[in-house]
Amino acid sequence: MVNVPKQRRTYCKKCKVHRVHKVTQYKKSKERKASQGRRRYDRKQKGFGGQTKPIFRKKAKTTKKIVLRMECVDCKYRKQTPLKRCKHFELGGDKKRKGQMIQF
């Protein structure tokens, strides 16, 4: 399990100094209906002939790489940094303490 704090003090390219950054997890946005690839695919699918492009079915990976989106508190400049693959990701969870009992 990976636990990342909600704020990180790191270098800002725009300010050119270390500043506090607000950390969020990157999420894929909704696909655009008018993008060139979508228009081409829709045009190809029209009419007779069934499915024209292969539908990908051989999934190999069980996890995705976590991408952190960091936004500078002062200038609102955003940067993204990838982490390693992990099954469980937590943003701003409780820190581990030595010698503490596990509570459920």
Curated annotation (Swiss-Prot):
Q: Where is this region: Disordered?
A: 23-60
Q: Which GO-annotated molecular functions does the record name?
A: structural constituent of ribosome
Q: Give one Pfam hit by family name.
A: Ribosomal_L44
Record key words, sorted: Ribonucleoprotein, Ribosomal protein
Single GO BP term: translation
Q: Which stretches are tagged as biased composition: Basic residues?
A: 23-43
| Annotated Gene Ontology cellular component terms | ribonucleoprotein complex; ribosome
User: Matching InterPro entries, A to Z?
Assistant: Ribosomal_eL44, Ribosomal_LSU_eL42, Ribosomal_zn-bd
> Which PANTHER family does the record cross-reference, listed alphabetically?
60S RIBOSOMAL PROTEIN L36A/L44 (PTHR10369)
Q: What is this protein called?
A: Large ribosomal subunit protein eL42
What organism does this protein naturally occur in?
A: Ochlerotatus triseriatus (Eastern treehole mosquito)
What's the gene? RpL44
